[in-house]
């Protein structure tokens, strides 16, 4: 079958990486596993041999012959023919996720997962995306993505995966990443506002926090002059001279809370 470029299909063929993903997810016969992207079923079959239940969300119904073969062999596999971004995941009851994700939905599907109550996710991403997810302050990989994902999950970069592990071979390297869900390590008063602050400051990651906020005041929906006034008012409560890429996540959380309170006072 010719894979769909539109759907970003690159099927994982190398069984060594299939086994590595399953091993790092520590799958047991009590686990209910979610997979996104059936492919030719290489990962699905190995999951089904161990897990109690495997849900697979797949959009491309041309893969039905592979699905039929797998469901005939494994009674614990259920295929959901739909767009993973549109499926209500709440009722599936999975506790682990293992998937070779279509790269063009990497960001939205990851944040959709993070809204759910799961233990562990072992996921395949484009290499550069994976490095940014795991990025730490004062590195070139540290980004809005790093802070947003690490807010309520620990991120472990497991290994680089070469194009030769897939069919067809993608033009880029890939990587396996493990996400372990947890409670946030710091408190933000409003998560949606926190996301706006992240977007605002990381548009200018090499600038100071103060300069980045002023230049992206529209992202937090505050008039530029009003924002300047707020920053002057709270200048002794936060180090606005620090560069964005050097500012730890919890400090950005503190910044978000300060701004949230001050903006509320404007209304």
From Swiss-Prot:
Residues at which S-adenosyl-L-methionine binds: 12, 37, 58, 83, 100
Pfam families: RrnaAD
Gene Ontology CC: one annotated term: cytoplasm
Location of this chain's protein in the cell: Cytoplasm
Domain of life according to the entry: Archaea
SUPFAM superfamilies the UniProt entry points to: S-adenosyl-L-methionine-dependent methyltransferases (SSF53335)
GO molecular function: RNA binding; rRNA (adenine-N6,N6-)-dimethyltransferase activity
Keywords: Cytoplasm, Methyltransferase, RNA-binding, rRNA processing, S-adenosyl-L-methionine, Transferase
Family annotation (PROSITE patterns): RRNA_A_DIMETH, SAM_RNA_A_N6_MT
Predominant place of localization: cytoplasm
Enzyme Commission (EC) number: 2.1.1.-
Keyword Transferase: yes
UniProt-listed HAMAP family: 16SrRNA_methyltr_A
Family recorded in the similarity comment: Belongs to the class I-like SAM-binding methyltransferase superfamily. rRNA adenine N(6)-methyltransferase family. RsmA subfamily.
NCBIfam families: ksgA (TIGR00755)
Function: Specifically dimethylates two adjacent adenosines in the loop of a conserved hairpin near the 3'-end of 16S rRNA in the 30S particle. May play a critical role in biogenesis of 30S subunits.
Protein name listed in UniProt: Probable ribosomal RNA small subunit methyltransferase A
Gene behind this protein: rsmA
């Amino acid at each position: 079958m010719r894979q769909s470029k539109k759907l970003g299909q690159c099927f994982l063929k190398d069984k060594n990486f299939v086994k590595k993903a399953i091993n790092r997810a520590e799958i047991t016969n009590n686990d209910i596993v979610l997979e996104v992207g059936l492919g030719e079923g290489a990962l699905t079959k190995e999951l089904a041999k161990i897990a109690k239940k495997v849900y697979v969300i797949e959009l491309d119904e041309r893969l039905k012959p592979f699905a039929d073969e797998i469901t005939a062999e494994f009674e614990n596999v259920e295929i959901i023919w739909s767009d993973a971004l549109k499926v209500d995941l709440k009722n599936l009851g999975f506790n682990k996720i293992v998937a070779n994700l279509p790269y063009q939905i990497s960001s939205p599907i990851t944040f959709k997962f993070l809204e759910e109550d799961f233990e562990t996710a072992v996921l395949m991403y484009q290499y550069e995306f994976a490095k940014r997810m795991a990025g730490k302050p004062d590195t070139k990989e540290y980004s809005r993505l790093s802070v947003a994902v690490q807010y309520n999950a620990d991120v472990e970069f497991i290994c680089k995966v070469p194009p030769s592990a897939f069919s067809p071979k993608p033009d880029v390297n890939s990587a396996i990443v493990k996400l372990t869900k947890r409670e946030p390590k710091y408190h933000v008063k409003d998560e949606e506002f926190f996301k706006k602050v992240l977007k605002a400051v990381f548009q200018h990651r090499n600038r100071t926090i103060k300069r980045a906020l002023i230049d992206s005041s529209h992202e937090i929906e505050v008039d530029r002059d009003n924002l300047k006034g707020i920053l002057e008012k709270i200048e002794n409560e936060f180090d606005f001279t620090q560069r964005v890429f050097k500012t730890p996540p919890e400090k950005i959380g503190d910044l978000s809370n300060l701004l949230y309170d001050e903006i509320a006072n404007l209304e």
